[in-house]
Amino acid sequence: MSTETASGPTEDQVEILEYNFNKVNKHPDPTTLCLIAAEAGLSEEETQKWFKQRLAQWRRSEGLPSECRSVTD
């Protein structure tokens, strides 16, 4: 039975996304994003959205602003 809901990826998909986020690249280029999406069985839009949210979460945990700004701000 699938636990997949309209609200987001399954546990297995999140595992793939987390692995890529932590071990491969926090800022995947379009080609890498496409490969990660294919591996996780998600659309590129869903994958990109997940990475964006995950990056904001990571930046907050590191004590950084959730959005990228220049160092001079």
From Swiss-Prot:
Localisation per UniProt entry: Nucleus; Cytoplasm
Classification via Gene3D superfamilies: Homeodomain-like
Annotated GO CC locations: cytoplasm; nucleus
InterPro entries: HD (IPR001356), Homeodomain-like_sf (IPR009057), HOPX (IPR039162)
GO biological process: chaperone-mediated protein complex assembly; heart development; lung alveolus development; negative regulation of cell differentiation; negative regulation of transcription by RNA polymerase II; positive regulation of gap junction assembly; positive regulation of skeletal muscle tissue regeneration; positive regulation of striated muscle cell differentiation
Entry keywords, A to Z: Cytoplasm, Developmental protein, Homeobox, Nucleus, Repressor, Transcription, Transcription regulation
DNA-binding region(s) from the entry: 3-62
Stored PANTHER family: HOMEODOMAIN-ONLY PROTEIN (PTHR21408:SF1)
Oligomer status and interactors: Interacts with serum response factor (SRF). Component of a large complex containing histone deacetylases such as HDAC2. Interacts with the acetylated forms of HSPA1A and HSPA1B. Interacts with HSPA8.
Role description: Atypical homeodomain protein which does not bind DNA and is required to modulate cardiac growth and development. Acts via its interaction with SRF, thereby modulating the expression of SRF-dependent cardiac-specific genes and cardiac development. Prevents SRF-dependent transcription either by inhibiting SRF binding to DNA or by recruiting histone deacetylase (HDAC) proteins that prevent transcription by SRF. Overexpression causes cardiac hypertrophy. Acts as a co-chaperone for HSPA1A and HSPA1B chaperone proteins and assists in chaperone-mediated protein refolding.
Name listed for the protein in its UniProt record: Homeodomain-only protein
Species for this entry: Bos taurus
Source organism phylogeny: Eukaryota, Metazoa, Chordata, Craniata, Vertebrata
